[in-house]
Every structure is written in C-alpha cells, then in structure tokens.
Amino acid sequence: MAAAKKGAKPKVAGVRFAAGFPEEGAHNHVHFDEQLHDSVVMVSQQEDGNFLVKVGFLKILHKYEISFSLPPVQRLGKSICAVPLPTLNLKVLSITSQAEGHSIKCEYTAHKEGVLKEEMILASETNDKAFVKVVVQARVLDRHHGTPMLLEGVRCTGTELEYDSEQSDWHGFD
C-alpha cells in the first residue's frame, strides 16, 4: 500500500484571502513589524571562541563602513590590534577599547554577489599567542535587485566603478 502512494500527488486546496484584502491594482508597500527582526549588526561568539558578525544585505560594488562591538575576551586583554591580512575587501579602520569589550570599525567592499565571508584576526598586544578570528558575513545583492535597508552600524561610503567593455576607449587592433 505504501508503494502505491509513493507517486501520488497531494491534494491542493484553494487560496483564501483575508476579508480586508485590498483591491487589485492598489498601491501597496511591504511593512515589517519592528519586533520581527533586529535592525542592528549581529555579533555572536562561536563554540571555538571566534566571532561571527552578520551585517545583513549589501549591494554589489559598494563600499561600507561597518561598526560593531565585541564583548570582552579574557585572553586578549584590553590592548588589541588587527593582524595584517592579504584581503582587499575588508580593512580594519580602528579598534577602540570600551568598558565592555572593544568597538571595531572596518571598511568592507562588496565585490561579488552571494553570501560572502571575510575574516580579520585580532591579536593581543601583550600576549603573542592570544588572538581571535572575526568573520564578517554579508549577503550581497546584485545591482538589479534594488537597494537594501542597511542595519544600524552599517553605512554606505561609496561605490566601486564597474568595468564595462563597451565603455572602453580601446578599439582593438587595426
């Protein structure tokens, strides 16, 4: 009997709309309740002690200044610095010690679409062996999908020029 139902398709019922549904053609906007989601950059500590920073939706070929706070990390102490890494897309601008942790400000370039992860390493200035990895995760939209609402702590600082071969001055070989 189970084999006979294996290829059967489920029945689909009709769709009903609420009584107050607006007429077709009415101009509608999507509104989100403020309590449905947080509108700030999310910082979470992973099981291994490293951090994941979710900065939300960004637009491709745009530069952003991202500010967030890390909770205190005992092994790092108060004085920390960014370890230079060979990445063009994430640059630490400043690290400020606070009463409860550190405030980090960085510059992020959204260079391709999709879910992107860039990492920085923060090290103790007093203990050579103490460091923590911070992964910045962004969901980057292509240029045809509108302008995303930026989270608190994320600020667009400019756009990157997109290379288009049709705009080139080069006309090829004669």
UniProtKB/Swiss-Prot annotation:
Subcellular localization(s) per the UniProt record:
Secreted
Keyword Secreted present in the record's keywords: the answer is yes
Q: What domain of life does the UniProt record list for this protein's source?
A: Eukaryota
The answer to whether UniProt assigns keyword Secreted to this entry is: yes
Record key words, sorted: Secreted
Q: Assign the protein's first listed, main location to one coarse class.
A: secreted
Q: What is one cellular component GO term in this UniProt entry?
A: extracellular space
PANTHER family attached to this UniProt entry: ADIPOSE-SECRETED SIGNALING PROTEIN (PTHR13287:SF2)
**Record's protein name:** Adipose-secreted signaling protein
